[in-house]
Amino acid sequence: MTVSSSVTAPPDGRMMHARLMNGDRLTQAEAAAFMHEVMEGNVSGVRLAAALAALRVRGETPEEIAGFAQAMRASAVRVQVAPREVLLDVVGTGGDGAHTFNISTTTAFVVAAAGVPVAKHGNRAASSRAGSADVLEALGVNLDAPPQLVADGVNELGIGFMFARNYHPALRHAAPVRADLAARTVFNILGPLANPAGASHLVVGVYRPELTRMLAEVLRLLGAKGATVVYGSGLDEFTVCGPNTVTGLRNGELICRTMHPEECGVSLHPKEAIVGGSPAENAEITRALLTGGGTPAQRDIVALNAGAALRTAEQVESIAQGVARAREVMASGAGWDLLQRYAAHTQRAAS
């Protein structure tokens, strides 16, 4: 007697390329299977370029992006932090071309000093002069600290930084194609979705307003407990230069709104007031802000982003409350003390 199995075979990633070229939409599982083949180096450069171009023309679905991110997470070097209710990442897609100072990096240390565990995932500069990795390196952080030391940073100090290049080695198979295309592809938005420590709560900045709802839906599909996705009038983070397009994920529901800085107790400022410079110059701005200094515009934009992060992590009842808490932390110098302790912690690997 033949016994039929009710177990469905996993999708064959090798067949998904043809589906994409036909204009078909993939399920999350199918997209994950295709990206797994990419991560394994089993998709030729020509086929990958064609698939990325087809996706760009047709437009990716939330399920496809979630599947791609799922495969990236599976292939990443893991950072095993102790179980906790909240583990936050504050990250942007980049690509806004605004050349601001390192707002999300500074924000991460303010939020961690306020008591929220942070596992920040970041890279060197792509479209700016100084990425999060560049400025943290300038501040004495060892970017090549091993995963266990980064996990210990989260567990013992409340913060860890994961240099993306070290945690996603499988992306090397896609790197030549991405460089040759010289255009935005789905890979530009996957990095913030593939935190190697498995952040439960995320603040994600994006470079187009229509991506706010899209990525919030992706994060819901990926099981995030809470998230805020923002486009800040040309910035891939909350801005103090105009309105913010925001989609929040809370209790499994998406809430879309336009948020003005004045609602949260911060003033409007011109974009020129938040421009940064070289890694050394941005490191000095971060140091000033974490020790209670900086300009009013710099303080306001970090306080706003930190306030939103504290709200996302469910530590305050409103962004305005979070802004007030962030101002207290910056004035106290606790964020700078934390950064110095974390830098010393990472240097243990080099000694």
UniProtKB/Swiss-Prot annotation:
Quick one: which residues bind Mg(2+) 2? D236, E237
Q: Which residues bind anthranilate 1?
A: G92, N123
Record's keyword annotation contains Transferase? yes
> Subunit notes for this chain?
Homodimer.
Q: Enumerate the residues binding anthranilate 2.
A: R178
Q: Which gene encodes it?
A: trpD
Residues reported to bind 5-phospho-alpha-D-ribose 1-diphosphate:
92, 95-96, 100, 102-105, 120-128, 132
Which biological pathway? Amino-acid biosynthesis; L-tryptophan biosynthesis; L-tryptophan from chorismate: step 2/5
This protein's cofactor list reads: Mg(2+)
Pfam families named in the record:
Glycos_trans_3N, Glycos_transf_3
The name this protein goes by in its record: Anthranilate phosphoribosyltransferase
The processes (GO biological process) annotated in the record are:
L-tryptophan biosynthetic process
Return the EC number.
2.4.2.18
According to the record, how does the cofactor bind?
Binds 2 magnesium ions per monomer.
Cite the InterPro entries for this sequence: Anthranilate_Pribosyl_Tfrase (IPR005940), Glycosyl_Trfase_fam3 (IPR000312), Glycosyl_Trfase_fam3_N_dom (IPR017459), Glycosyl_Trfase_fam3_N_dom_sf (IPR036320), Nuc_phospho_transferase (IPR035902)
Supply the source organism for this entry: Deinococcus geothermalis (strain DSM 11300 / CIP 105573 / AG-3a)
What family is reported? Belongs to the anthranilate phosphoribosyltransferase family.
The entry lists its GO molecular-function terms as:
anthranilate phosphoribosyltransferase activity; magnesium ion binding
Q: Which UniProt keywords apply?
A: Amino-acid biosynthesis, Aromatic amino acid biosynthesis, Glycosyltransferase, Magnesium, Metal-binding, Transferase, Tryptophan biosynthesis
The entry's function note states:
Catalyzes the transfer of the phosphoribosyl group of 5-phosphorylribose-1-pyrophosphate (PRPP) to anthranilate to yield N-(5'-phosphoribosyl)-anthranilate (PRA).
